[in-house]
Amino acid sequence: MDLQIKGRKAIMAGGSAGMGRATAERLAEAGVELFITARGEDRLMNAAKEMSEKYGASVTPIVADSSTEAGREALFEACPDPDILAITIKPPAPNGNFLKVTPDMWRSSIETTLIGPIEIMRHYIPGMTERKWGRIVNIATFSAKNPMIWRLMSGPARSALLNYTASVSREIAEHGVTLNNLLPGMFRTDGFNESMEPYADAFGLEPNMDVCLAHFMENNKIPAGFLADPDDLAPMAALLCSELSRFIVGQNIVIDGGQHASIF
């Protein structure tokens, strides 16, 4: 499928691994001029090199923590006028015990998963509306719609992000700019592996990956019957970044193998 974005400038914030990397690969394959950010320099540089060689694409790595003002400024300087903005920001460490959550932990969660994406969008939206074309996609989490105690530090702030984008998306749609959210469920990523310890804490389990995974699959039925890979999300992310998605506005698209049962 031709996404009709060849030559466009695209940012993938958090593009060195996991769902961000998989999405970046799809964008590079589509022929965009790609900018990817991440905090870890070595993995970021390797990702940029591999994608550039594989797809013959221009891939610029930007070492930056998008949850900080300094990190965002580095991004803004490196790519001042993108056509496409995709964002995934690693959330705070999971915590399965609500009694252990402190005000400082809440502030960190909000700064990372709410203020960070909002400030990036707020910076780039005026240019997109002026140019009468733009695509913005937030890769968040299905716990924004489906609360889970062991995802307590991720879900609430992301729910606020969904509320924000629902309003803003309708303000900018008339200018040819679309804004949507993807809400992934359980994917095999580094973040999933790191969540097993708080998951064990929340349910009184041995902190062992096999034990926790067996418990999760038994108690959180995924109709599809498996945990997803990042490549299971990337095609939808790329579609939302494309010319083909011009009539998709303000949507929260759940990609979870059917785990979250809802008609909306």
Predicted feature descriptions by range:
Residues 83, 99-118, 137, 154, ...:
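Catalytic Tyr-X3-Lys loop
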Residues 121-122, 166:
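A short, exposed helix-loop element centered on a Lys and neighboring polar residues
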Residues 137-160, 165-174, 185-188, 220:
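Catalytic loop of short-chain dehydrogenase/reductase
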Residues 4, 146, 226, 238, ...:
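Short C-terminal tail/terminal secondary-structure segment
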Residues 9, 16-17:
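Conserved glycine-rich cofactor-binding loop
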Residues 72, 90, 96-98, 102-110, ...:
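Substrate-binding pocket helix/loop in short-chain dehydrogenase/reductase
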Residues 173, 178, 248-250:
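Short, small/polar-rich loop/turn modules that mediate ligand/substrate recognition or access, typified
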Residues 126, 170-171, 246:
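Alpha-helical segment proximal to the catalytic Tyr-Lys
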